[in-house]
């Protein structure tokens, strides 16, 4: 599963790990991606999205119908 949120567009961020002796090594911070199924009453079917936890809050706030409409307007295939 890729570390990409379909709702918010969050991707991994990159930086450095710094040890006690200040040696720096590359690392990445992945968003907390959850694979969730949502029921769309207007279409009578369920869809599965890769969503970050912030994306889940967005869906709770605005509703799945409006979020899916924005995704389709953006060109996401659902």
From Swiss-Prot:
Q: Where is this region: Disordered?
A: 1-27
Query: Which Gene3D superfamilies does the annotation name?
Result: Ribosomal protein L28/L24
State the organism's lineage. Bacteria, Bacillati, Actinomycetota, Actinomycetes, Mycobacteriales
Q: What is this protein called?
A: Large ribosomal subunit protein bL28
Stored Pfam families: Ribosomal_L28
Q: Which SUPFAM superfamilies match?
A: L28p-like
Q: Which InterPro entries match?
A: Bacterial_rp_bL28, Ribosomal_bL28, Ribosomal_bL28/bL31-like_sf, Ribosomal_bL28_bact-type, Ribosomal_bL28_sf
Key words, A-Z: Ribonucleoprotein, Ribosomal protein
Q: Which cysteines are joined by disulfide bonds?
A: none
Q: Write the gene name.
A: rpmB
């Amino acid at each position: 599963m890729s570390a990409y949120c379909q709702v918010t567009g969050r991707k991994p961020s990159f930086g450095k790990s710094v040890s006690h002796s200040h040696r720096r090594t590359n690392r990445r911070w992945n968003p907390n991606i959850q694979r969730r199924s949502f029921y769309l009453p207007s279409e009578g079917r369920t869809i599965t999205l890769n969503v970050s936890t912030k994306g889940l809050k967005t869906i709770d706030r605005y509703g799945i119908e409006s979020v899916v409409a924005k995704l389709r307007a953006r060109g996401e295939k659902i």
